[in-house]
């Protein structure tokens, strides 16, 4: 199945680039309808369109990814797709999953296959990563979760996979305290939440949205009591069901769901 690679001009995310690929769109008037066995779909919530993917209940394996077998960062989805294919696996969806440095390696906690590559980052600083409370997305014995950074540190968890990012979008059912309904900063954004069924729901906006609008989608539209922001400048999605393979900019840590052929 050939996937369409989407690229942007030098002014990445220019307004002319906000184009949704043709898919069924579900209008939300409250919680999102159940997705059934489909892993990805487009939804609308309060006038905005989002693409969502879920790994729960559909036989997919969910993992984080950063370095290829060569020891270099994948940077683009097609590298990950090809490596999985060589191993007899099919990538169903993937997205960028956490912030990184100039070397495309994570700046916060990162765990892959039980190995801690980068330790938990509890420092203060500038930028979205340090807009506390921030948090950790993790997969422990196949079960996904999102915890605020300090809560994760105290939990004693040693998950199989994890990626730290920030800020938290929703924390115990409440929006991040620094988000405002009158906020004016609009960007394409992506993140992950854990819904009331315990499924990880990955979301990318199809147009520029505020932090408040994005967080509200997770809490009120997707029934997520905890959700974590991944990024807002390089947000990218690979979704086989949607025929989509974004290649705007090189990426650092990724999260992806795959199945065996």
Q: Where in the sequence are the language-model features?
A:
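Bacterial N-terminal signal peptides that target proteins for export
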Residues: 3-20
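Bacterial N-terminal signal peptides
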Residues: 18-29
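Zymogen propeptides
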Residues: 32-128
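Short, surface-exposed charged micro-motifs
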Residues: 52, 136, 191
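Short, solvent-exposed aromatic-acidic interface loops
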Residues: 67-70, 151-155, 205-208
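Active-site-adjacent helix-turn-beta-strand microarchitecture at beta-sheet edges
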Residues: 105-179
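Conserved, well-ordered active-site substructure
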Residues: 107-123, 178-227, 235-261
């Amino acid at each position: 199945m050939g996937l369409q690679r989407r690229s942007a001009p030098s002014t990445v995310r220019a307004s002319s680039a906000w184009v949704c690929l043709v898919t069924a769109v579900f209008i939300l008037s409250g919680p999102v309808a159940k997705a059934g066995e489909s892993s990805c779909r487009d939804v609308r919530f309060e006038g905005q369109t989002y693409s969502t993917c879920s790994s729960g209940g559909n036989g997919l394996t969910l993992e984080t990814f950063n370095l290829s077998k060569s020891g270099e960062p994948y940077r683009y989805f097609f590298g990950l797709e090809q490596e999985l294919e060589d191993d007899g696996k099919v990538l169903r969806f993937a997205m960028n999953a956490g912030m990184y440095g100039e070397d495309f390696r994570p700046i916060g906690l990162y765990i892959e296959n039980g190995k801690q590559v980068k330790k938990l980052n509890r420092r203060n600083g500038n930028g979205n990563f340090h807009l506390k409370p921030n948090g950790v997305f993790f997969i422990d014995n196949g079960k996904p979760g999102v915890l605020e950074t300090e809560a994760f540190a105290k939990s004693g968890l040693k998950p199989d996979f994890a990626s730290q990012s920030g800020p938290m979008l929703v924390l115990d059912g409440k929006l991040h305290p620094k988000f405002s309904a009158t906020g004016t900063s609009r960007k394409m954004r992506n993140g992950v939440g854990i819904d009331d069924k315990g499924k990880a729901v990955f979301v990318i906006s199809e147009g520029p949205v505020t932090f408040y609008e994005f967080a509200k989608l997770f809490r009120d539209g997707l029934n997520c009591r905890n959700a974590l922001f991944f990024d807002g400048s390089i947000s990218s999605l690979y979704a086989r069901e949607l025929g989509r393979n974004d290649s705007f900019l090189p990426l650092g840590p990724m999260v992806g769901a795959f199945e065996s052929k």
